[in-house]
Curated annotation (Swiss-Prot):
It comes from Bacillus subtilis (strain 168). Disulfide bonds: none annotated. This is Uncharacterized protein YceE. Belongs to the CAPAB/TerDEXZ family. It comes from the Bacteria.
């Protein structure tokens, strides 16, 4: 039975799940019926950051144009441009054993592609969630439903995976940003 988290809750991933080395971070969402006549393309990304909350270089940013971190520790399984259907819309696979030692945190985010041009925002998104699945057993370990707390935001930091005392933990963030992917990149120390 998966643990249901609320915004701000933290939970130990690797300590409470001995043997967990690879996790599937599944992200899903629905878009409301009215979307202004444009396709709604949401994109999941991962920012691998150091102790200063910054990506060391552009390769620490895993997204639809850079599907795999050089370490092999974070892999994006590909862009879903419609969000149609049930279950995960996009997935990011994290192999904790391959994450470089200088990486302290992995920020998992979702943005709306071309949000400003299409007049779209997270106020038009519902049923957004993130879940963590043990890749080996396929057991869902935890789930965080984001709720309907957004309006004008075009980017969301959904959660963070972070190191603590040799273990990996999960932090349910659910924090919205205006300014889309560019704002998130700046937040994590990347030049855009």
């Amino acid at each position: 039975m998966a643990i249901q988290l609320s915004k701000g809750q933290r939970i130990d991933l690797t300590k409470t799940n001995p043997g967990l080395t690879k996790a599937v971070i599944g992200l899903g969402w629905d878009t409301n019926k009215y979307s202004g006549g444009h396709d709604f393309d949401l994109d999941a990304s991962a920012f691998l950051v150091d102790a200063h909350d910054n990506c060391v270089n552009d390769l620490d940013f895993v997204f639809y144009n850079n599907l795999e971190h050089p370490s092999g520790g974070v892999i994006h399984t590909g862009d879903n441009r419609t969000g149609e259907g049930d279950g995960d819309d996009e997935q990011i696979i994290v192999d904790f054993s391959k994450i470089p030692a200088h990486i302290e945190k992995i920020g998992i985010t979702v943005t709306i592609h071309d949000a400003e041009a299409r007049s779209q925002n997270f106020g038009q998104v519902s049923n957004a969630f993130v879940r963590v699945v043990d890749e080996e057993t396929q057991n869902e370990l935890l789930r965080f439903d984001l709720g309907e707390d957004f309006s004008i935001e075009t980017a969301v930091v959904v959660c963070e995976l972070y190191r603590h005392g040799g273990e990996w933990k999960f932090n349910a963030i659910g924090s919205g940003f205006s300014g889309g992917l560019a704002a998130l990149c700046r937040n994590y120390g990347l030049q855009v």
